[in-house]
Amino acid sequence: MASVTEHAQWGVGCLPPLNVDKQAIAAAFSRAAESYDSAANLQRETGHRLVQLGQQHTGFVVLDAGCGTGHFSQHWRLLGKRVIALDLAAGMLDYARQQQVADDYLLGDIEHIPLPDQSVDICFSNLAVQWCSDLGAALSEFYRVTRPGGIILFSTLAEGSLDELGQAWQQVDGQRHVNDFLPLQHIQTACQYYRHHLTTALYQPRFPNVIALMRSLQGIGATHLHHGRQAGLQGRQRLAALQRAYVMQSGGYPLSYHMVYGVIYRD
């Protein structure tokens, strides 16, 4: 069962760019296209919350930036919006197109959005910007393509996410094998140039065993590491060692996601 705690944060600049292999990330998510929806419990929960933050906005054109399989593209469309689905992973975008979830489909990078200035009313990006090399560049692009009076909605992961898994791997072989996520303060810094509001929440599902935990990551394509190594399912002996090293809580194996929800107002 997931437990959630939350509180509001407001932005307080240059952020260090991450070393991100975009082609490898796109390939990892393309491979996960068929399994993604059945495994994406966290993405569904965060996405629905993000939609609630902006669904009263009267704007008509929505950009779903990092659309994945298009689950939320379809959700916005059912709310009467015209939806542009954008993703870096060709496999994900092809799957979304097959499901006919949007009005237009764009293969592209959030940090270099292939749209003219001021072309959408709502820019929606659920759990995608943590894969960017430069959060500031992504937010700048969101702001550029959004019309004045529009709204930008994004969610991302902050430092501390997947920490239990990283600590367990450290016990096994001295390496964490999980991605590093930006500290909350760095996310606040990236938002400081805009009128905005940030909210944080802790999402902490528990799993019956380490294999189920690792499969939850593999099913959504999230086993790719920023610096290039894969952290997918391992051999039996390594998984057994990982399970021994993993600290149980309340009869399960927890995995923390430190969520950040952002709303930026396009002035």
UniProtKB/Swiss-Prot annotation:
SUPFAM superfamilies: S-adenosyl-L-methionine-dependent methyltransferases
Signal peptide annotation: none
Reaction(s) the record says it catalyses: malonyl-[ACP] + S-adenosyl-L-methionine = malonyl-[ACP] methyl ester + S-adenosyl-L-homocysteine
E.C. number: 2.1.1.197
InterPro entries in alphabetical order: BioC, Methyltransf_11, SAM-dependent_MTases_sf
Pathway the protein contributes to: Cofactor biosynthesis; biotin biosynthesis
Gene Ontology MF annotations: carboxyl-O-methyltransferase activity; malonyl-CoA methyltransferase activity; methyltransferase activity; S-adenosylmethionine-dependent methyltransferase activity
Domain of life: Bacteria
Membership in a protein family: Belongs to the methyltransferase superfamily.
PANTHER family with a match to the protein in the record: MALONYL-[ACYL-CARRIER PROTEIN] O-METHYLTRANSFERASE, METHYLTRANSFERASE
Name the record gives this protein: Malonyl-[acyl-carrier protein] O-methyltransferase
Source organism of this protein record: Yersinia pestis
